[in-house]
């Protein structure tokens, strides 16, 4: 079936003008597949945002040959991108004289649907929408289906994009299956679609008493709702198996709503298995386990038995899933963002203790496959990530633009960007579970994002706070003290006065919290940037490998510092966005290059050289090292990454480090934290 991308690609690759001026209000040109296709035709996109920065790049890299449009149909082309049609008229005269105007937008692709509603979708949902749109009947002589208003468009999207047919939700099984499809699949339901769905469900008397808004919008709340009702479901099975209950489990439920849920129904049960597997639901100690299992054997997945056996069983099931779901070479970046949290869950379980040899062999084999697959994917696709536009940022430098859009929606609500320096996804899984026990009223919206490679603080954290790519801060790329300047510059350029912006780093203890509290209480800050570096400090001092790392991170989280920091911010009305600048990985030493002063940066997982020639001399002595391309990096910044899970330290030494391109270093959490309203 044709794709919505086809007319865009056809227009941009048509023979003729080498310079095109494109209005792209919906960021369609930043779609991953569109970018890949354009790169295959040697077509470069150059956004026109800052006129001075644009002119510098244009003159240095693209101007030669553009004025005369010479070079033939197969010559490299440039697409200058602006946000709207009218902005093309404001481009410099030399571009207007030589360029051809084009325009692409969702309103052109889906003219029969309400544009504001369609625009709320993530680009990942456009394929499903286009397929459904093309299948709609047309009147004789018409190329488009009948026009739908806003409400009808919302219903259309709910049904055909999110597989939610409100008329088909008639009982608890239907409702629960719909909720589980959304939450387990990680689907983002736009706010106006969620509102439309809630309006319909709230009018249905069959769902009176269900906390529908929280169940639909808050995955963690939905999991707590299920967790509390799981023992009650086991009660019912145990009674059927002959047990006599002294005290029903319902007495311990806190979340309102129906007490009995149809966990065993055909559309629900497969999700329950997976939720226990992924750690979103926790097995419970149940006194009548034998009776419940006798009735329905599958419920054993949600009942504690022998802790060691439970752990081995869970590791085996995670291995089954991860072996099956390892992303292929043509996978989208979203596939890796979805894979990383499940790999993190396996890592947490794996490092809790020993396992049988056969299980260990499976783990190490899968990890080797993962390292090869992820590196191959990065080498092929990482270059297209930096400009991705999505409802959740694809890379850390896209976080400030994302926060700016969030602030436009709620301009009166202050925001805080909290960076837990060096926290990998597996460590977030530990911290998250501790937080859930300490502060059950927290509402966490979890996502993930890519760090910059090399995964070191001066590169990735500076990009994170400045909202720019490393090539734009080449003069300070070796500094760890420029985050505040980048953060201040971003927000002043986006409309905030300096006294409404704040930044504080190295937040570690109660005294630092007191300082922050006094600072926030004395000034009305609208955008606060914070760095807590305890986890990175643990990593750099770790001599016990990842098992020791996990143990100390758990101790740190249980100490309550992070919970207190979140309380401080949430009590003052902030919405908190928690992320990391990079992760970390357990690595084994292969020796340190005796390179004298030729390396500008001598890290444990990366060396930085001023030229490819100098890098090559070291690479020749360390087979398997990775000459990382300078994608998005400044000239004269040439990285050499350690191979796989190795490090440039004494041979055989085991450390926890970062700087390379392992999955655990590159993909980091991005979590929105709010306090759940009653």
What residue ranges belong to the model's regions?
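…; additionally, a secondary subgroup of soluble metalloenzymes is captured
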Residues: 1-415, 422-576, 580-678
